[in-house]
Structure formats: structure tokens, C-alpha cells
Amino acid sequence: MCFIGIGHAQERKIAIVLHAGAGYMRPDMYTKDQVQDYTDKLSEARDVGYKILENDGTSEDATVATIKILENSTLFNAGKGCVLSHNKRAEMDASIMNGSDKNAGAVAGVQRVKNPITAAQAVLHNSPHVMLSGSGADDFAEAQELEMVAPSYFVTDERMEQIKKMIQEEKNKTDLFRDAPESLSDNKFGTVGVVAIDKQGNICAATSTGGMMNKKNNRIGDSPVIGAGTYADNRSCGVSCTGHGEYFIRLAVAHEVSALMLHRGWDLEKATNYVVHKELMDIGGAGGLIAIDRKGNISMSFNTPGMFRAARSSSGENSVAIFSE
């Protein structure tokens, strides 16, 4: 009689990857101190999530904790310091999905919940719906006893100056969505996202954003749309996207990566690169994505000059980067 693996079950690989936006970022646009600030915050967020995984926490707990750190930082386009819509207000979107049961939750256009990702998580667990929007989503978050703030909490002086400048250029008949100067165009490509796989092999993906600077009031991008900006399936992968959301919606980018793996048998790297560098670019879409497959392999693919990103896994990967390298 042969007993195999009794008491020696192989521990699954754990991994976490995050992005904080893809866009027209070049080294000459940032001081050394600014680069250090970004890399420090990305590393901090990554390590908080990884520690949760390391201590037997779930991938869902890891993704939410990581995104909250990014939402609470004014460095990124999510939560406090996010970009502003045409009405000079923060209208934020977020979503989360578990690959184990494909349950998901999302909110769009929230203005009062301090951490939009927690509202999306509350929808996942405590609502029969997948997505809530606007004041109804804020009211739901408040009823769930999540931390609420005044809309002014999210507005920084820097973002207010940016929106005023863009509105003035709009009045001067500048086509902001096609001909914006590069100094401003990176504001269109915010978003933060996290994908993680825990010791149980469960994948979770989550995304949070302020959307597009000077967007029309109540515009909704890909971030809260399950299958477009966020997707997770334990059979294939978890994906979180960043970029010009309209293109990601049209291609259902996050789900497309999973579908290529499931139905064509492609590996993660081939699927992500094909979607980002072929399918997206064929229709003029700019941006990127992060992904983790069921084996814990990580992909960070983007077709812009840069993407704020970081990753860590139990197989030794430990990285943080901003620019194309």
C-alpha cells in the first residue's frame, strides 16, 4: 500500500500584482523624488496585500486591503485625489470579482463613500444585484455602515487646477479627447487595480477609478463593468484593466483574456499580449492590464509608454516599475 503526500501536501503558489494606471508617463516628466514617492506607495500596497496572503488570508481580503491603500493616496486616480468630471466633482467607480464562484459586485458614480472598493465588496456580499450606481450606491454604502465623507474630501488643489485648465481649453475649441497635449493626456488613463491568488487557489480581481478627467457627468467607464475592466475565473485567470475605458468595454477585454485561455488553450502571457498589443491597438485603444493565472503566473502588459505596477509572489518575483523597460 502506498501513501502519497500524506502530511506533505504541496502549498499552492501565492501571488499579487497591482497597477495604478497606464498612460503617457515618461521619465523626463517626473523628478527623482516623485518617482520615489510612487514606487514607495506601490511597494507598500503590494506588501500589505502579500502579507495577508502569506498569513493564510483570502485573495479577496488581499485585493481590498491593497486597493484601499491606493484609494487613500492622492498619488493615483482612485479615491482621494482622483480626477474630476466636467462638473468639478469626483464620480468614482469600482468593482470586485471572485474566481471561485464568479460572484461580483460593483458601484458606479459614487461621491460619498470613502473607499469605493468597500462599496463594491458590500454589493458582492450583501446585495442581490451586481452593480449599483449614483446616489443609490452611496445610500447603500451608508446603510452598510461604511465610512462616508463629504464629496469635497476627494478634491485636491492639483486636480481642481487640471479640470479648470481642461475646461478652458474646451472653450477654446480644443478637441481634448483626440488632441490633448501629452502633459494632460496622462490624466485620462488613471485607475488602480489588484489581482491576487491565495493558498486555496482562489483568484480575486478588483479595480477602482475616478474615471476620465473632464468626463461628461455620469459617464461610466470599464472599471465597474464585469468582463470589461475586471474579471476572475479560477479555471483561467484574474484580470484588472486600465486605459481608455470605452475601448475596453467594446472588446470586453478582461473576459477576452480568460476566454482565449479557456477556449484556445493559450497561456497567460500570450493571451494578455494579444489582447493589449493586437486587439486593442487595432481599434485605437490605449492602456494595459495586470493578470494572474491559476498557477500563480503574473502578466503586466501595456501599450502605452508607462504603467504604474508592482508584483510579488512566493516563487521569488518582487518588482515595482513605472516606465516601459
Mark where each language-model region is.
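Bacterial Sec-dependent N-terminal signal peptides
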Residues: M1-E11
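Alpha/propeptide regions of enzymes that mature by internal proteolysis
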Residues: Q10-E325
